[in-house]
């Protein structure tokens, strides 16, 4: 029956299916062995049976009855992968490998199960599948998909041709030919390949689903949604098309229809994990607070919205003014921004599934999702830098109609982070220097592939850095206007490499000139420092270290280790000298364990507070995400009553973690010290969300400040809250007597909308 399906002989396939169904219904006891249970399970799925019941009553039972048959493991894995239940698929396939280690299908499925979590093992499994069968069509098709993701369209076509040489009727291969034509702006080719792929009616809806899915994976959500709608016209109950359309719509900001579709799929198929996750998330989003300003709709946890929601709106407004103007973009409004205190919720909203631990934020064009500092532990990233980065994606994606390669989109966003604040974004480091000089640079013409299956997390971060370096190179050598013209070319469908050639002469020349540029930048990093990896002295004593240091006076690792050894001995003066030398040679170094970090400890132990202050100021000017030196500097500034510096630095701490009480307390102290009563409103409002020891005092102070700021209604509310907590609070009683019943509303306050995520 499956063979007839693949050969596009649906009538003969249906005859067999009906015959199988008749036999099972007549004598079910004859088909209760493990192998036949799997066949019956597949039959029920084809007839629209409940996937969860098929899994439990057919596949699981077959596996229990005979763990040594591979049929149940493969069937379970295929169903789990369709539902994106990668954990179940992986556990099932690991058993299958033990039973049948020479089956290419097992390794192909294993590669798909491993893909989201272990790219290296996934690639190895794919290679094993082709080693066992060079003509394994599913594997060849999957390779074509990956090459499309890397924008290696010629190579992808070669894989598809190999598939079609074996099976000229392979609908999915023809569908991917249509995808490539679409991405290359070949509309006639797209239509031709689509027509061929759709000539077999039983897979007609699948063809549109496959094309739409791949386009959405390339961030072409509008085109992807159009294809899913076509699929649903042909098959209104096509579950995969419905849930994909739901996600497309949610990523386009069309939330009402998107949530309705997710709910419908969840009711239709309770084993659809993405639908279940989305419906569950929608219920949690109902408890979020919604803020609006300047074309932005921001959803946040209610408590967090009170603490720093105003800062989010202000940051987004600044980013809009700067970046939309710079790139000549009139935004399509509204821009949705959703900030999640739970990383799992962020992942589900973004990807449909838990995971994505390395992502701080994601932009789809008009929708931004981001992790709040609450989801990131003790050392969160600078959320202002994250939102600036993601909003830059809004600008460039909208300018290009989502038709830009990932490397250019990420490169511009990182570049603009650096332009906005020297401590944001990425800069050349010792690790990046080693990659560049060690021939780890990816040619510009192949950069999109650097983001797929990088060999390590460092290499993924380097892909972002290299992309920003390409943008910097283009702006320095060809100008910002040329970069904007490239974006304009992309918006009308011109391939990136063709556009680059228009302005740089040739891709080969661009690749070579950029490599020279990057290598020159790497070599210019700390030119007086020796970065070679030398063996440190075997004997850990003062004499051995001094002798080793004299023989290798300016070695990067050596100076660091030499200083660290003296610090272990608590010989602070001896540790200071090599650290000063490191800072002299390599002031750009902000990697973990850098000279700033070590020397700050030394200076504090020595009690040289003025020198420590200067060092910490130099450090935070280069690193926009490091929290401990900022906290220490706040202590120093407060001790010295440098209130202007306290105010400025506390704002910097809030850009990293606004959920800490101490920067709000410092802002409050600075405002009190300078007699700026109105400026106490923001820190007092935030601190009241952090379970203060004396809430009555804070409510009273806030009421007093609000009255001074011309907000008597809010002042009355808070003075009443003060009296709720402390009924005999004399100052609060006196303030209540002063308040009139009439109060003007604050025109600057964010407009709060309904909590429903559908609005």
Region spans (language model):
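Alpha-solenoid helical repeat scaffolds
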Residues: 1-2, 32-39, 71-75, 105-109, ...
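Long, contiguous interaction/recruitment modules in multidomain scaffold/adaptor proteins
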Residues: 6-35, 42-43, 47-48, 54, ...
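Structural signature of tandem alpha-helical TPR/SEL1-like repeats
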Residues: 8-22, 46-58, 82-95, 115-128, ...
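Juxtacatalytic substrate-recognition/specificity segment
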Residues: 16-23, 57, 91, 124-125, ...
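TPR/TPR-like (Sel1-like) alpha-helical repeat modules
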Residues: 18-21, 247-273, 280, 655-658, ...
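Structural marker of alpha-solenoid helical repeat scaffolds
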Residues: 23-30, 64-65, 99, 132, ...
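Beta/coil-rich, acidic/histidine-enriched accessory regions frequently appended to metallopeptidases
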Residues: 42, 92, 109, 135, ...
């Amino acid at each position: 029956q499956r063979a007839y399906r693949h050969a596009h002989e649906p009538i003969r396939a249906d005859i067999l299916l009906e015959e199988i169904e008749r036999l099972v219904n007549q004598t079910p006891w004859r088909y209760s062995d493990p192998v036949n249970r799997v066949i019956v399970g597949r039959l029920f799925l084809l007839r629209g049976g409940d996937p969860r019941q098929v899994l439990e009553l057919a596949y699981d039972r077959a596996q229990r009855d005979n763990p040594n048959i591979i049929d149940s493991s493969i069937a379970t894995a295929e169903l789990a992968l369709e539902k994106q239940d990668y954990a179940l698929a992986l556990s099932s396939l690991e058993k299958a490998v033990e039973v049948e280690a020479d089956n290419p299908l097992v390794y192909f499925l294993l590669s798909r199960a491993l893909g989201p979590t272990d790219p290296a093992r996934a690639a190895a499994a794919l290679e094993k599948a082709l080693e066992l069968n060079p003509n394994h069509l599913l594997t060849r098709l999957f390779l074509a998909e990956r090459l499309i993701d890397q924008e290696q369209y010629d190579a992808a076509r070669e894989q598809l041709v190999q598939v079609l040489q074996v099976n000229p009727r392979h609908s999915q291969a023809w569908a991917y030919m249509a995808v490539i034509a679409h991405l290359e702006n070949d509309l006639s080719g797209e239509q031709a390949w689509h027509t061929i792929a759709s000539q077999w009616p039983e897979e007609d809806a699948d063809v549109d689903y496959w094309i739409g899915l791949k386009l959405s994976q390339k961030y072409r959500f509008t085109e992807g949604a159009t294809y899913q709608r076509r699929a649903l016209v042909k098959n209104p109950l096509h579950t995969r098309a419905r849930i994909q359309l739901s996600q497309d719509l949610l990523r386009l900001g069309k939330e009402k229809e998107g949530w309705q579709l997710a709910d419908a799929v969840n009711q239709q198929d309770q084993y659809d994990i993405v639908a279940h996750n989305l419906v569950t998330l929608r219920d949690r989003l109902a408890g979020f607070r919604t803020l609006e300003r300047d074309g932005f709709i921001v959803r946040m946890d209610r408590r967090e919205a009170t603490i720093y929601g105003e800062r989010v709106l202000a940051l987004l407004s600044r980013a809009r003014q700067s970046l939309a103007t710079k790139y000549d973009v009139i935004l399509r409004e509204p821009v949705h921004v959703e900030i999640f205190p739970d990383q799992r919720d962020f992942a589900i909203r973004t990807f449909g599934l838990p995971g994505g631990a390395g992502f701080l934020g994601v932009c789809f064009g008009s929708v931004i999702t981001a992790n709040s500092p609450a989801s990131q532990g003790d050392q969160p990233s600078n959320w202002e830098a994250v939102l600036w980065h993601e909003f830059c994606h809004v600008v460039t994606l909208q300018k290009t109609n989502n038709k830009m390669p990932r490397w250019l989109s990420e490169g511009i966003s990182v570049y603009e982070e650096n332009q906005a604040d020297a401590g944001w974004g990425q800069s050349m480091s010792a690790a990046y220097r080693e990659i560049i000089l060690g021939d780890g640079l990816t040619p510009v013409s192949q950069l999109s592939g650097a983001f797929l299956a990088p060999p390590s997390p460092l290499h993924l971060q380097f892909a972002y850095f290299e992309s920003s370096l390409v943008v910097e190179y283009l702006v320095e050598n060809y100008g910002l206007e040329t970069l904007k013209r490239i974006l304009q070319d992309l918006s009308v469908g011109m391939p990136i490499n063709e556009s680059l050639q228009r302005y740089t002469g040739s891709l080969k020349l661009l690749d070579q000139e950029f490599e020279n540029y990057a290598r020159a930048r790497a070599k210019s990093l700390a030119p007086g420092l020796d970065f070679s990896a030398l063996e440190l002295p075997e004997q850990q004593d003062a004499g051995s270290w001094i002798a080793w240091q004299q023989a290798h006076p300016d070695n990067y690792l050596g100076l660091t280790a030499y200083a660290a050894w003296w610090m272990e001995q608590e010989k602070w003066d001896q540790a200071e000298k090599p650290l000063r030398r490191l800072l002299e040679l390599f002031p750009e170094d902000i990697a973990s364990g850098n000279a700033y970090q070590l020397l700050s400890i030394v200076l504090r132990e020595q009690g040289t507070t003025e020198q420590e202050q200067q060092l910490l100021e130099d450090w935070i000017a280069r690193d926009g995400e490091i929290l401990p030196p900022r906290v220490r500097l706040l202590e120093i500034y407060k001790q010295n009553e440098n209130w202007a510096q306290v105010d400025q630095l506390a704002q910097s701490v809030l850009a990293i973690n606004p959920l800490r009480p101490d920067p709000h307390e410092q802002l409050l102290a600075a405002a009190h010290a300078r007699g700026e009563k109105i400026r106490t409103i923001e820190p007092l409002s935030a601190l009241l969300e952090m379970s203060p020891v004396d809430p009555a005092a804070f409510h009273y102070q806030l009421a007093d400040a609000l009255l001074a700021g011309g907000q008597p209604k809010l002042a009355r509310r808070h003075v009443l809250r003060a009296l709720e907590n402390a009924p005999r609070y004399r100052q609060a009683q006196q303030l209540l007597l002063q308040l009139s019943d009439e109060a003007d509303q604050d025109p600057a306050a964010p407009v709060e909308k309904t909590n429903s995520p559908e609005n």
